[in-house]
């Protein structure tokens, strides 16, 4: 799974604002994906890649994710790629999904 366009946009905007971010992505190895596919799983079921961008802004920690199991990423039940949107974790109990990079920036600016 490739990094989504919205995550790239978000990282570029964070750079423009001089907000330091950390890439905490978990890229699933191609060998593991191929092994799972050889066992009958689809590409979508086999690729459990999760892209994560972590940053602190106005004394709040944020985690933005895209990938397997995220809102806007790959649905873990149907294995369908749902789209090119981001999920913002404000805290463990408050995820917000189906966001563009602009949506994420608007949310953090209002916090």
How should these model regions be labeled?
Residues 6-11, 82-111:
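Ampiphathic alpha-helical segments that act as solvent-exposed interaction surfaces
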Residues 3-22, 32, 36:
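Amphipathic alpha-helical segments
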Residues 21-80:
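Amphipathic, interaction-prone secondary-structure segments
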